[in-house]
């Protein structure tokens, strides 16, 4: 399955595929997804956790013990916790964000959903998220799972990547277009 989908290739794809197949066999796809979403949110909110995950300075034992404490406090148990501990033991914790992204892609494919990567300048409200999902569903004919990335550098608007298609309606791109047009005219 991983070889068919370019979004789940490489080391992260192999780990994501293994986790997905285990979760599917144990009928716990939704529980694992919820745990990974929780861990992903923890990463987004904690620079210290990001350092622990990404730094090669920490030995795998140190990473494993610290990770076990974090997972215990967050209430992440079972398949998800064991999987994250395996990543730490195998010195692959630095790819956890890519593994989570690839896992989500596998789950979306399994459920017949499309996945869109959306970059926005600031966090979207729930109302705007639902409107975006509805607009993308009307285009694809499928339910669309969103991977939201907040990047203030785009200034405003959004960038949507859905499969091989990309729509860049960011203010940064529009300003760059105006800048280039003015250079050509002047």
Swiss-Prot record:
This is ATP synthase subunit delta. Keywords: ATP synthesis, Cell inner membrane, Cell membrane, CF(1), Hydrogen ion transport, Ion transport, Membrane, Transport. It comes from the Bacteria. It is a peripheral membrane protein. Signal peptide: none annotated. Belongs to the ATPase delta chain family. Its main location: membrane. SUPFAM superfamilies: N-terminal domain of the delta subunit of the F1F0-ATP synthase (SSF47928). F(1)F(0) ATP synthase produces ATP from ADP in the presence of a proton or sodium gradient. F-type ATPases consist of two structural domains, F(1) containing the extramembraneous catalytic core and F(0) containing the membrane proton channel, linked together by a central stalk and a peripheral stalk. During catalysis, ATP synthesis in the catalytic domain of F(1) is coupled via a rotary mechanism of the central stalk subunits to proton translocation. This protein is part of the stalk that links CF(0) to CF(1). It either transmits conformational changes from CF(0) to CF(1) or is implicated in proton conduction. InterPro entries: ATP_synth_OSCP/delta_N_sf (IPR026015), ATPase_OSCP/d_CS (IPR020781), ATPase_OSCP/dsu (IPR000711). GO terms for cellular component: plasma membrane; proton-transporting ATP synthase complex.
């Amino acid at each position: 399955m991983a070889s068919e989908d370019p979004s789940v290739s490489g080391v992260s794809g192999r780990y994501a595929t293994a986790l997905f197949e285990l979760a599917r066999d144990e009928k716990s796809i939704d529980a694992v997804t919820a745990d990974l979403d929780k861990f992903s949110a923890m990463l987004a909110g904690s620079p210290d956790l990001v350092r622990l995950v990404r730094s090669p300075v920490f030995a795998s034992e140190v990473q494993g013990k610290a990770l076990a404490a974090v997972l215990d406090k967050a209430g992440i148990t079972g398949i998800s916790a064991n999987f994250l501990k395996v990543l730490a033991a195998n010195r692959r914790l630095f790819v956890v964000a890519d593994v989570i992204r690839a896992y989500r892609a596998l789950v979306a494919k399994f459920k017949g959903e499309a996945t869109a990567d959306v970059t926005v300048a600031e966090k979207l409200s729930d109302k705007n998220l639902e409107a975006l999902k509805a607009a993308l569903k009307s285009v694809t004919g499928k339910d669309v799972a969103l991977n939201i990335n907040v990047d203030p550098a785009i200034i405003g608007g959004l960038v949507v990547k859905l499969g091989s298609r990309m729509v860049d309606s960011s203010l940064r791109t529009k300003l760059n277009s105006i800048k280039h047009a003015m250079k050509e005219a002047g």
